[in-house]
């Protein structure tokens, strides 16, 4: 048997490590996806696929009318005026959508609730408990666990499986978008996140092919509270970041190492490039940036996230031209800045990831 020198062995091992390095991916958000018509779905999914997008994050809040310039089929939120007031329209709509998305190589990340709905009193949680008591009241916690159970037990006629079993369609579940925003009681929030993550895990009934994630905060540091790293039920910690100081490799890298040491994965679940010259984390008003300037911002910040080893979800990619409302981060498919975002999405798929998500992607 011929023995390798230490130097030769090092080269071989390095080559093997490079060969099997996990690849990153790009993803997007569309909170009103359940309202899309079939043709809008086709436009969106075709565009996302062309940009290398592997996951789309969707919400279960009700929406109506024209949303972000998209004339949608209106739908109610999952729950209404009381804990027994269920409307499964949003789930039924997403049954069809997730099956169609599968054909484009895309899975869904399901956000089970949003702080936006809580704060806006769009269902009974806000009306009964408000943003203060919702995270600590024992009855509210029990009722929200029932919501989680209801969602995961929902059966999709497209595959005859519950959502908890539908790993071919679903990438991950999160309890709530930007829970307790702003974070007035961090200990209570950390406890709530872990409690709800365990509830999701329990309702997955041993299915480890679907991930459990948080729903982010308003910036990097408050997206990654210390208690999340020690919660055994959380697989993924989600970052939301719009400030330019947060869209920086040197800011993100220490958290990557912290997550790896804790056995967690990270995703940049929300980020965006403002259409105007307003502050990027307060994208209201201001004058439109030149196409080339915004293109450069998109490419620069996406590359910085890629370099940190974190997959990213853009906020948001639309199936129609961006109408340029307030908080204007959106990019429409085949609209201004689409070429830059599409190129960034494809580049993400070639970047190395600090975390191996390949078992959870199509």
Write out the residue ranges for each language-model feature.
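Short acidic/histidine-rich active-site segments
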Residues: 268-271
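Gly/Pro-rich active-site loop or hairpin
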Residues: 280, 285-286
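Active-site mouth of glycoside hydrolases
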Residues: 22-234, 243, 261-264, 275, ...
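Fungal secretory targeting signals
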Residues: 1-21
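Substrate-binding surface in catalytic domains of secreted glycosidases
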Residues: 244-257
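C-terminal helix/juxtamembrane-tail motif
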Residues: 352-362
